[in-house]
C-alpha cells in the first residue's frame, strides 16, 4: 500500500516508490496526500522516497499537494534508496530530509528526449505530408531533425523548467540560488555528500526519522 500509519502513531507514511507518473500515479497520489491536510487524526507525514524521478509536471503536482499538508502538519522525507530528480523535488517540500548514508540523491536537472526516425522512415520508404498552422506546430515530430530555431525553443523550455527546479531546492533547503546552480549538474551523489552540500539534513534510517518527527 502506498500509504500507511507508522506503528500505532498518528503519523502517516506515504511511499513514493518508483517512477513518478508510472508506478507513482499522479492523480491517485495527489488525492491521497491532499486528504491528509484536513484529517485531524493525522498529526504528521513522512515521505518514504525511493524514486529516480519522472514527469516534471507530475512532480510539481505532488510537490504542491505535499506543501498543502506541510502548511498545517510536520512533514519529513526519508530517502531509502534513491531520491533523484523528481524524487528529490518532492523531498524539498519537507521541513527535514533523512537519508541512508549510501542512498543516492540529487540529479537536479531536466532532460527531454526527442526521437528522430528520419533515416529509418526513409529506409523503409515511408514519407510524411505535413499541414500545419504555425512554424513550430510540428517541432516535436519524429519524422525529421529539429531546425536550429526549434532546438533553441526546446532548450528554452528546458531552461525554464530547470530554473523552477533550482528555485524549489533553494527555497526548500534555504540555500542561495547561485549555490544550488553549482551543485545542480544533473549528477547523483551519496547522501553523505549531499549532507555536506546542504541537500540532506540527517543521515539515518526510517526509524530515526520516525522518532524525530
Task: Write out the residue ranges for each language-model feature.
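Well-ordered beta-strand positions
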Residues: 95-96, 156, 182, 186, ...
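A local structural motif
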Residues: 74, 175-182
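Small-residue-centered hinge/linker elements
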Residues: 1-74, 82-172
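Glycine-rich beta-to-alpha transition loops that act as phosphate-gripper elements at the mouths
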Residues: 76-84, 183-187
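Residues within well-ordered alpha helices
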Residues: 120, 168-169, 183, 193, ...
